[in-house]
């Protein structure tokens, strides 16, 4: 429960007028009480009560006792902002190499071409020894990126992955849906999982086609045959072209919508990548680009009330941070004001959510840990390594893109009207220049990664799914491929931006 550190102070809260101002947005509600507090006790203490407090879409029936807006809350380590300054990301080259090998071990698992979500078969959520289409698409993209698209370095894994895709793409789905939107498959045989699950998962075809388009362009550049790769890309893209407005499950496989920001951004990005691949192999990419532009126009409205929201039934979500970092070049890029505003809202929410953040903020520790969404309860509802890493990457990308602007036009003074969100987020003084902003963005990325490293240090370099919100220890699925992918990718971007630093 958010505000655990102050929840036990209920009895000490002075009695307040019953007409207290209870018009408080969900993101700013601060728990007044403790689990099990009832309405009479809540209101007798001058706090606000809602019988149906919409913390998130999966807890609609849970009531909420919270402080009114006109009350001075107990001191909160999240109210004074964050320490966004560190001089390096914490992770050493040696540690990077260990994680790289652990990551590689999860690709082409058992020589099947599959990407195992994690080798752990005894997690709080059951076995992770499956190939998730989403995890695989994102992890393969990261694998190509961190290896600089070097054909010789990635050929073995990508040839195997391409073979896997061809095998599963035309399976008959016993669940009665198009197999292209099936969430996960058994390893090594590649059969659709038949247990109960949130279906369909509509970002899957886009993410798979994204990865295969990137691989296809590498093969083309190295004189290889791309015909079979084009077949799998065009087959997945055909689904996206016809069905991008259809209802599906969210990134976390819990709620449904036709309008998830993550899914929309995955469509836009993958359509543009497929268009590039089409052009390279003599196909027509115009339809892909036109559809990407159509989706982009329909997605502009997700910036509302000062931040980018994931969906109407799950507005505050770390998936948005992932979207900006991974797909943002086509809409609301990492260096944008919308990006900074969203970081501000999301980080405040997760500081309030996790006692470990409050404790470490109070101690002045740089950075922050973030998770899926406020009110999450899966496996303890903790910070996630893959999301914290992608927040670090988002800062790095913001700095990199700011440096590129400086390269094009020289250093320049920041105009408050054009940069107020970044100035506010990073506490930049009056008179700051673009170079000051870029340095601060990189330092903020280092702050996030440094805090993450403090919690994941392990002799074997194993990176898990979550970090316990009370103890700060790694928890849940062990050796999560997606965690390796995002941490390594963030550090890869950090290395690429290093050339700009004085």
Model-derived regions: residue spans:
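Low-complexity, Ser/Thr/Pro/Gly-enriched N-terminal "stalk/linker" regions
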Residues: 73-134, 160, 164, 168-184, ...
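Aromatic-rich carbohydrate-recognition surfaces in CAZymes
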Residues: 127-243, 264, 487
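Cleavable N-terminal signal peptides of Sec/SRP-targeted secreted and luminal proteins
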Residues: 2-19
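Well-ordered alpha-helical scaffold segments within catalytic/enzyme domains
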Residues: 80-89, 137-152, 207-223, 266-282, ...
